[in-house]
C-alpha cells in the first residue's frame, strides 16, 4: 500500500507512524478482502491547532479532534448497518489527519499505549474512507465490530 505521510508537528517524530500506518492499513484492507497493493492513502500528522482549523473548515466544529477523514468518493450504503460498496474502488482512497496532542491525551486517559491508539484511529479513519460511518446505531455497531476484529489482527486489545 502506498501511504504518503506529511509530518506537520515535531511530536510525531517519536513514533514510527509510517510503520503503524502501513500495518493498520494493510490489516484493514486484507480483512475486507481487498488487495492493499491496489490502493493509496495520504495522512497528515499534525497538532491540535492545525486539526482544529481543519475541523472548523470542514465540519463547522471549532475544536480539536483525534482524526479527520476525507474519502476520495462517496461509498456510503443507503441502508443503515449495511456494508459500503467496495467494488470498483478508486486507487486513491482519501486523506486522513491525526492530531498528536488529542491522540496522546486520549491514550493516557484510557490507559492505552499511544501506538495502539494511533493504530485504532488509522483503522477508524480508513474505514471512513471506505464508506463506513457511525451515524446510526447499526452503522456504529458494524464499524466497531470491524475495528475490533482488525485491531485483534495487529495484537491491539479491544478499544471499546
UniProtKB/Swiss-Prot annotation:
Q: What is the UniProt remark on how the cofactor binds and its stoichiometry?
A: Binds 1 zinc ion.
The protein's required cofactor(s) are namely:
Zn(2+)
The UniProt record gives the binding positions of Zn(2+) as 124, 128, 134
One GO term in the molecular function aspect is: metalloendopeptidase activity
Membrane-spanning segments: none
Compartment(s) of residence = Cytoplasm
Show the InterPro entries listed in the entry.
MetalPrtase_cat_dom_sf_prd (IPR023091), YbeY (IPR002036)
Enzyme Commission identifier(s)? 3.1.-.-
Example GO BP: rRNA processing
Q: Which controlled-vocabulary keywords does the entry list?
A: Cytoplasm, Endonuclease, Hydrolase, Metal-binding, Nuclease, Ribosome biogenesis, rRNA processing, Zinc
Record keyword Nuclease present: yes
Name a GO CC annotation attached to this entry. Answer: cytoplasm
- NCBIfam families under this entry? rRNA maturation RNase YbeY (TIGR00043)
State the family named in the UniProt similarity comment for this chain: Belongs to the endoribonuclease YbeY family.
> What's this protein's function?
Single strand-specific metallo-endoribonuclease involved in late-stage 70S ribosome quality control and in maturation of the 3' terminus of the 16S rRNA.
Protein name (database record): Endoribonuclease YbeY
Amino acid at each position: 500500500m502506498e501511504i504518503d505521510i506529511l509530518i506537520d508537528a515535531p511530536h510525531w517524530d517519536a513514533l514510527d507512524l509510517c510503520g503503524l500506518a502501513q500495518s493498520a492499513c494493510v490489516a484493514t484492507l486484507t480483512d475486507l478482502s481487498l488487495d492493499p497493493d491496489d490502493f493509496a492513502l495520504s495522512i497528515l500528522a499534525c497538532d491540535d491547532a492545525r486539526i482544529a482549523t481543519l475541523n472548523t473548515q470542514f465540519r463547522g466544529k471549532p475544536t480539536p479532534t483525534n482524526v479527520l477523514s476525507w474519502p476520495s468518493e462517496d461509498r456510503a450504503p443507503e441502508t443503515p448497518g449495511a456494508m459500503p460498496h467496495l467494488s470498483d474502488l478508486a486507487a486513491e482512497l482519501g486523506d486522513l489527519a491525526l492530531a498528536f496532542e488529542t491522540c496522546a491525551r486520549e491514550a493516557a486517559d484510557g490507559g492505552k499505549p499511544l501506538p495502539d491508539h494511533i493504530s485504532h484511529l488509522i483503522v477508524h479513519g480508513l474505514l471512513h474512507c471506505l464508506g463506513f460511518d457511525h451515524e446510526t446505531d447499526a452503522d456504529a455497531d458494524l464499524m466497531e465490530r470491524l475495528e475490533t476484529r482488525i485491531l485483534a489482527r495487529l495484537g491491539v486489545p479491544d478499544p471499546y
